[in-house]
Swiss-Prot record:
Gene name linked to the record: cysK
Enzyme class, first EC level, given as a word: transferase
Catalyzed chemical reaction(s): O-acetyl-L-serine + hydrogen sulfide = L-cysteine + acetate
Assembly, per entry: Homodimer.
Pathway: Amino-acid biosynthesis; L-cysteine biosynthesis; L-cysteine from L-serine: step 2/2
InterPro entries: Cys_synth, Cys_Synth/Cystath_Beta-Synth, CysK, P-phosphate_BS, TrpB-like_PALP, TrpB-like_PALP_sf
PANTHER family listed in its UniProt record: CYSTATHIONINE BETA-SYNTHASE
Key words, A-Z: Amino-acid biosynthesis, Cysteine biosynthesis, Pyridoxal phosphate, Transferase
Pfam families reported for this sequence: PALP
Protein name, UniProt field: Cysteine synthase
GO molecular function terms listed in the Swiss-Prot or TrEMBL record: cysteine synthase activity
Residues with the N6-(pyridoxal phosphate)lysine modification: 45
Protein family: Belongs to the cysteine synthase/cystathionine beta-synthase family.
Enzyme nomenclature, EC number: 2.5.1.47
Amino acid sequence: MTKIYKTITELVGQTPIIKLNRLIPNEAADVYVKLEAFNPGSSVKDRIALSMIEAAEAEGLISPGDVIIEPTSGNTGIGLAWVGAAKGYRVIIVMPETMSLERRQIIQAYGAELVLTPGAEGMKGAIAKTETLAIELGAWMPMQFNNPANPSIHEKTTAQEILEAFKEISLDAFVSGVGTGGTLSGVSHVLKKASPETVIYAVEAEESAVLSGQEPGPHKIQGISAGFIPNTLDTKAYDQIIRVKSKDALETARLTGAKEGFLVGISSGAALYAAIEVAKQLGKGKHVLTILPDNGERYLSTELYDVPVIKTK
């Protein structure tokens, strides 16, 4: 039955989970993906954008007309931009200049202002610039890398949706990329209590494997591996770490569109590559779930879709 909603913010969450059919080897475990692109702003970050703003409103920190400023690699900025537009805030987004053109355009299309920082400085540079501007403008910073409303919303929504979907199916592994760590931490906190047999895998870029104790470095997987360990990441929430090379993330993302029929972003390619590796290890009869954070349309100008897709036989 079709329902009439009072505001677009009511559409956040309850994203679908589907089983992959053509990318997975015959003898591997079944792989399921949660498509966060079905959120209004087309990414998982819509959840935390709404959660952080509403938590701040409840605490009396902000009200419509105020300025919100945030450093972000893109998707959180998009989420804050559209939620801010719907609620009546002035939104300023600060991001490294290396982020995709589409992300910049979408943020500005929602009426937000955009400030770019040198790509070589990574997220640290964007954070430093944001802190300076916040003081100058008297703006409120959600601080997604520190805000407890980030992992909390995944405990309250994402994890509950997963439990509901898998109440008749054993979930043997949960795989998640780590940007702020909010998704992985929030979901893991719930799964470890409700489904302790589920193994939790954290995914990071091979070239910037900070979780594995390596030095940060440049990589191409936009949205994960920020180069430091965020406060919103519970490092006890995962059981194992999988490091994914940028080239493998790119290739897997391309194949997902060509083989499964939906376009995904680079971090989705990384998560899916890792999930398939886990599925191969577990074997037939097991079940693996991963989160696909966004869609591929905001990466059409990047090298992700700048090469012909080669279909595997």
